[in-house]
Swiss-Prot record:
Function of the protein: Component of antiviral defense system Zorya type II, composed of ZorA, ZorB and ZorE. Expression of Zorya type II in E.coli (strain MG1655) confers resistance to phages SECphi7 and T7. While most T7 infected Zorya-containing cells undergo abortive infection, a minority produce viable phage progeny. These eventually accumulate to a high multiplicity of infection, leading to culture collapse by 170 minutes after initial infection. ZorA and ZorB probably assemble in the cell inner membrane and exert their effect there. This may be a nuclease.
The encoding gene: zorE
Keywords assigned by UniProt, alphabetized: Antiviral defense
Protein name from the UniProt record: Zorya protein ZorE
Keyword match Amino-acid biosynthesis: no
Annotated source species: Escherichia coli (strain ATCC 8739 / DSM 1576 / NBRC 3972 / NCIMB 8545 / WDCM 00012 / Crooks)
């Protein structure tokens, strides 16, 4: 006997809870998390041998992580009252961690990819509590995060630092997203938001209002942005069609995570449509992935000319070997999300160019 079951309400509920641009299907497989993802969401003790090699961001089994010291003996009570009184957490291989590495003190560190800014600390005597710790300022400088090479700017970034925004800025660098981003629901939208969004995007022909990319072949990467930040204000003058990359770059939109595959699609379409042309530094930042902005900003700070975004690098037989995020053809250097080797070029991954300039290893005379 066949049963007729009306599940339309369930489908509508699923559509409301999913991120913008994503459809809901009952036959989709649920998101499975490895045990390591569960451990990292609460904090896992690690040693230096456990961490993936690299000179910029800290990575553990393909996952972007933070390092912090759980043991707050001697300052536990002070840290609970004021997180700034606690020990700093680390987002990059800064000089502080280099010193710890030399002292072989990494057994004291825990790794986590929790994005709410809370860290579980203890007093060594059985008491533990989640605390809002502060980011290491050496780490900010190490990545030149949002221009932290400037001391005044670094202090401003330190005070306003958001882990959610940080993970969003570097989401393209890792194979796995933090578990915390899947625990959120899209609250605040009206019940028929999906229909409104589809109508607005169709009227705009799925063209991003900022960068101009046509996403008719990748509609899931086409979003609708509320200019005033109020999700239930759906007057047409308050709605703006943006690609997912431009959407995450809007103020207070750090909750949008772009994967490396998604960014590659957006950049490929921009390139095919002749949109990767920039006449100013601001346009360079608009057209490149936020994860390499620290490296690009370092070159700007040192007085170099703006790079070429999305440049195809060819071998001697004119075959395209790699498409890099940003390049300085005259210097034969480039920055990219992933490692690449092209004869005659020096290609840096995220944070490597910053470090080479900071340590004095990079000079135009050597090129």
């Amino acid at each position: 006997m066949k049963l007729s079951i009306d599940i339309s309400e369930l489908i509508q509920l699923g559509k409301k809870m999913l991120p913008e641009g994503v459809d809901f299907f009952l036959d989709e497989s649920p998101i499975d998390f490895d045990p390591i993802d569960i451990e990292l969401s609460t904090g896992k003790e690690v040693s230096i041998e456990d961490l993936d090699p690299g000179s910029g961001l800290i990575s553990y089994h393909g996952r972007q992580v933070l390092l912090y010291i759980r043991d707050h003996s001697g300052r536990y009570d002070a840290a609970i009252v004021d997180g700034e009184k606690g020990k700093r957490f680390h987002i990059a291989w800064c000089r502080t961690l280099d010193e710890m590495r030399h002292k072989n003190r990494f057994e004291r560190y825990h790794a986590t990819n929790r994005i709410d800014g809370l860290f579980e600390i203890d007093d060594g005597s059985g008491r533990s509590q989640d605390v809002d710790l502060r980011v290491c300022m050496n780490c900010l400088e190490r990545l030149n995060y949002k221009g932290s090479i400037d001391k005044q700017r670094k202090r401003e970034i330190f005070k306003s630092f958001s882990l959610n925004e940080f993970f969003s800025d570097y989401s393209t660098c890792f194979r796995h997203m933090p578990k915390g981003i899947y625990d959120k629901t899209n609250s605040g939208y009206v019940e028929n938001w999906k229909e409104i969004s589809k109508e607005i995007r169709e009227k705009a022909n799925y063209v991003c209002n900022d960068c101009g990319v046509n996403l008719s072949t990748a509609k899931n990467l086409c979003h609708v942005h509320h200019k005033n930040g109020i999700k239930y204000d759906n007057h047409h003058e308050n709605l703006l069609v943006l690609c997912k990359d431009c959407h995450r770059k809007q103020p207070l939109h750090e909750g949008i995570f772009v994967t490396q595959a998604e960014m590659a699609i957006i950049q490929r379409l921009r390139s095919q449509q002749g949109l990767l042309k920039a006449e100013s530094w601001n346009e360079i930042y608009d057209l490149t992935d936020p994860s390499v902005h620290g490296d690009i900003n370092m070159m700007q700070h040192k007085g170099f000319q703006p790079p070429v975004p999305g440049l195809d690098l060819q071998n001697s037989e004119h075959e395209i070997i790699a498409t890099v995020e940003a390049a300085w053809p005259g210097l034969k250097i480039a920055v990219n999300l992933t490692p690449a080797e092209v004869e005659g070029w020096r290609i840096y991954t995220v944070g490597e160019l910053v470090k080479e300039i900071q340590t004095g290893a990079f000079t135009p005379a050597k090129l």
